Regions:
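Glycine-rich beta-strand-to-loop/alpha-helix junction loops that act as flexible
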Residues: 67-72, 118-120, 246-255
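ATP-binding/phosphotransfer module of carbohydrate and carboxylate kinases, centering on a glycine-rich
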Residues: 1-62, 85, 90, 107-114, ...
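Broad gene-expression machinery/nucleic-acid interaction feature
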Residues: 13, 65, 121
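Short hydrophobic interaction/assembly module
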Residues: 56-60, 66-76
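Solvent-exposed, flexible loop/coil residues
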Residues: 40, 67, 77, 139, ...
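Structural motif
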Residues: 69, 95-97, 279-281
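Phosphate-binding/catalytic loop of phosphoryl-transfer enzymes
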Residues: 73-169
Length: 296
């Protein structure tokens, strides 16, 4: 059986899905994180391990194409290095793309559209007339508003604000501090500065649950971040010269685990766009391999 492999490598985990040529899923597996800017060696090893598990079961010779979507590969020569290492390990044709570009292909193929992504990080990828461009996606130091990491950091900024002013902790602060196992200066700093972004972003569900249960501070954070994501989408719309109807896709755990943030995002778009439709389905970026194979 001939098949294709798509890999969506993220800051928290990497997802591999193999498809037969009709688009049916024939193998799935989750592996370790894949961000070369964080750790190139671990990223390559995680990807090779995932592919090896798949080819061991389905046969290496039957695989026609592997597409890998990964954050930061447009920086330096990461894409070239990953392609070299993975092709060297398996002898299979490899396409390495920025994760947002690959996800956009999975949603729209070659059609025009804007994909807003909010997971550990955040970005927009917009394509029009066959040309794509990233908007946002500058990372946690320069941006990432609306991301799981940024949302959690906003909550921790409130915590340290309260500590410095001898203010009582609110309910959200208490839940977050209980989760990290401490409330002292050293314990908070150890958690924030001693963990990768993915570990910090993993606390996002606490804030999402708080908002769903009526916690006003949690809701305020998510409302603000939903508006930030909408502003990024509107920036992408204007930058690419859209003037009429547009299709917008939303992807990532932040959108799909917070009804409040998602609704705020849609409400903001409705204020500024005359006509748009939303693809709310959380489509796996791995499906882009089907589109890429069809172009060969």
């Amino acid at each position: 059986m001939k098949y294709l492999i798509g890999i969506d490598a993220g800051g928290t985990k990497s997802e591999l899905v193999a498809y037969d040529l009709s688009g049916s899923i024939v193998f799935e597996k989750i592996g370790g994180a894949g961000n070369p800017a964080v750790n190139l060696e671990n990223t390559v090893n995680n990807i090779i391990s995932l592919i090896g598990d798949c080819t061991e079961e389905l046969g290496k010779e039957e695989c026609l194409l592997i597409s890998i979507g990964m954050a930061s590969v447009e920086t330096g020569n990461y894409a070239e290095l990953i392609k070299k290492y993975v092709e060297g390990a398996f002898g299979i044709e490899i396409v390495v793309l920025n994760d947002a570009e690959m996800a956009c292909m999975a949603y729209f193929g070659s059609d025009d559209g804007i994909l807003a992504i909010a997971g550990t990080g955040s970005s927009c990828y917009v394509q029009k007339n066959g040309k794509g461009e990233m908007v946002g996606g500058w990372g946690h130091i320069l941006g990432d508003e609306g991301s799981g990491y940024h949302i959690v950091m906003e909550a921790f900024k409130n915590i340290v604000y309260r500590i410095d002013r001898n203010m009582e902790f609110d309910d959200l602060s208490e839940k977050l501090l209980k989760k990290i196992g401490g409330s002292s200066r050293s314990e908070i700093m150890e958690f924030i500065y001693g963990n990768e972004k993915s570990a910090i972003a993993a606390l996002f569900p606490i804030i999402a649950r708080g908002a769903a249960d009526g916690d006003l501070h949690s809701a305020a954070i998510l409302d603000k971040e939903g508006k930030e994501l909408a502003e990024l989408t509107l920036t992408a719309y204007g930058k690419k010269g859209f003037s009429g109807h547009v299709t917008v896709g939303i992807k990532g755990g932040v959108f799909h685990n917070s009804a409040l943030l998602k609704q705020t995002y849609i409400n903001e778009l409705e204020k500024h766009l005359k006509s748009f439709n939303i693809i709310e389905e959380n489509i796996s970026a791995t499906k882009a391999v089907l589109y890429l194979n069809s172009r060969k």
